[in-house]
Amino acid sequence: MEIVIMIQEALKALRRGEIVLVFDADNRERETDMIVAAEKIKPEHIRIMRNDAGGLICVPVSWENSEKLGIPYMTDIMEEASGRYPVLGKLSPHDIPYDEKSAFSITVNHRKTFTGITDNDRALTIGELAGICRDDRHESFGDLFRSPGHVTLLRAADGHVLRRGGHTEMSIALMEMAGLTGVAVCCEMMDDRTGNSLSTEDAMKYAREHDLIFMSGAELIESYMEFRS
């Protein structure tokens, strides 16, 4: 399938609330993530990610929405608190082998959830977060959510894939190209047999068997650059 056609099919799938698969790069995490639009999230998406992917279910948030929500990078929180808790300074992730900085932010639950971990609770939290970003109600974030929680937020870099080539930014690039709210859901695909990340070949096989779009990060970034030009 030609890249242009494949990307267009992926964007249509995202608008329909379907999952797409994205492999980042051989010189990065070497992982394939399941990605779906946060505003389309349902408990069944959480179940599929939990059972078929098995990694950490996270919520990439665009730089613009992160700024409006006021969510910091976790590393900034740790740095601020290291004066009182010196161990946090020692735990700084300055030696990540595949990147310069972690995208991790805070964890949240919606206040209507119970424990926050069930498929229903996580879908509620994610969907409501996408909703306040879509409707430009960012100021209600603190009233509607509590932290810590069971949904991990990832803060995308300013400029997204033009500045950083992580799944966080690639997820947001897909949302932008699809005309969707700049909040996504992603989960790394793991391999039960090896205990490692699922190989690209097996991820592509999964995509074929489940009629899902699979793309590489290079294809996504190339398409995004054309989209922005």
Curated annotation (Swiss-Prot):
D-ribulose 5-phosphate binds at R28, E29, D33, R164, G165, G166, H167, T168, E188. Mg(2+) 2 binds at E29, H167. It comes from the Archaea. One of its GO terms (cellular component) is cytosol. GO terms for molecular function: 3,4-dihydroxy-2-butanone-4-phosphate synthase activity; magnesium ion binding; manganese ion binding. GO terms for biological process: riboflavin biosynthetic process. Its EC number is 4.1.99.12. It catalyses: D-ribulose 5-phosphate = (2S)-2-hydroxy-3-oxobutyl phosphate + formate + H(+). Gene3D superfamilies: DHBP synthase. It holds the Pfam family DHBP_synthase. Pathway: Cofactor biosynthesis; riboflavin biosynthesis; 2-hydroxy-3-oxobutyl phosphate from D-ribulose 5-phosphate: step 1/1. Mg(2+) 1 binds at E29. The record marks H150, E188 as: Essential for catalytic activity. Its cofactor is Mg(2+); Mn(2+). Binds 2 divalent metal cations per subunit. Magnesium or manganese. Homodimer. Catalyzes the conversion of D-ribulose 5-phosphate to formate and 3,4-dihydroxy-2-butanone 4-phosphate. NCBIfam families: ribB. PANTHER family: 3,4-DIHYDROXY-2-BUTANONE 4-PHOSPHATE SYNTHASE, GTP CYCLOHYDROLASE II-RELATED. HAMAP family: RibB. This is 3,4-dihydroxy-2-butanone 4-phosphate synthase. It comes from Methanothermobacter thermautotrophicus (strain ATCC 29096 / DSM 1053 / JCM 10044 / NBRC 100330 / Delta H).
